[in-house]
Amino acid sequence: VAAGSRILFSRVGQVAANAAVVVLVAQQLGPAGQGHYSLTVAVTLLSASLLGGGMGLAAVPALRQGRVTPRRLMRAQALWMGLMSVVLGAAAWWAITDDAAASWLSLHLGWTPALAWLVAVGAFGMLGFEIFTYNLLARGRLVVGSAVNGWRALGHLLVVAALLLTGRLTPSTAVGAFAAAQLGGLVAIIVVACRDLRRPAQPINGMPGVPLAPCELPDDLDTRPLWKLAAFNPRHGALGQLSAVAYFLLLRLDQGLVEHFRGAAEVGIYSLAVYVGEMLWLLPGALTPLLVHSSAADASDPRRDRTAARAVRMGVGLTLVAALPLYLLAAPLLALAGGGQYEASVNALRALLPGIVAFAPGVVLAGDFIGRGKPHWNTQASVLTVVVNVAVALALIPRHGAVGAAWASSIAYACGSAVMLWRFRRTTGMSLRGLVLGRHRRPLPA
């Protein structure tokens, strides 16, 4: 409870800082500039997801079972990050020097040559932050990642505010502030992870003596050459990492479709609604790191499944409580982000909120599935959700624009969440009454 409260506190601060950044950028850049900014951030997210390689996901069972020392694992991860920095640098160089690529990026994303390097820096910071956050989660440091995220969001806000006050907030400097925030978060998490090497790993709180869920790992993992250890993680974490890629496509592919059919200004209108709505997921997301840790317990202990079900109920409750007033106050709140420029964002946000609430269980269960050693379940649900989203979006966006994209997302989110809840109930054998009401037929052992 204490860890969850601290994570939630950090997430609330992160939500507030992110909301302020969205408002400042949207006000200054206008719909077209906001659209280009949102699409550029999406490219950064996609690059980080593709190049993460499952290095963080694959580390969780290895660290939890003591098959590899944290110090050697970090060295292998640093080797991987070095290779990915070369890939990002080469991609940025190609985006600048290839005339066709530079022309396309300028037309659709509003890029200047310098932006390619900023995107590479931001993607490098994001993929490294994710890797080392999983290391800390595996060692029982449940709060650290959320705390650093909160400080990263605050730093991002301060930089954006300074740029605005000095009259220097442009699309390029907005992306630069975003990239600097990601790189700063990486530096902070590396410092924390290095300091953590001197501490013993923490046990599963509240579950003394509970064995870890079985996960097949080679016995010689810690004695392999560093390059083989670095190669092991992508082979065993790539499938789970596809979940991050699919999740990105779920959240941002529709913006690409909006740009294709309706232009960058419509993306700006839609992206503002998306940013505001998705901030609500930070609340149930506070429970995700707890489940990554607690759901690694053996299935023989019933507290594991009931803890996950309780987290689902809490996540839905938190999201619903925040979504109801946001639905009612959407018009005056979005007016703060640019007045009449973003009037159309109101209906898009209201169409998006039912899906935001419906997907809250999926946000929570993503951590549970990772803890069980089944991250590919997240991938399967995300892929299905993407397929539904694209199919409905292609039908609605050409005619209805941002509102059509929002309804397509809501329908897709509901489908994805339903699949994840079905998977959870099938795996645990939990009744619907137990999941929804917390009333179970069998009492917990004394």
Language-model features: locations:
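Interfacial segments at transmembrane-helix termini and the short loops linking adjacent helices
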Residues: 97-119, 264-265, 327-360
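Membrane-water interface segments that mark the loop-to-transmembrane alpha-helix transition
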Residues: 3-14, 18, 40, 49-101, ...
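Helix-loop junctions and terminal segments of transmembrane helices
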Residues: 51-68, 138, 273, 277-302, ...
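Membrane-interface junctions at transmembrane-helix termini in multi-pass inner-membrane proteins
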Residues: 65, 125-149, 354-381
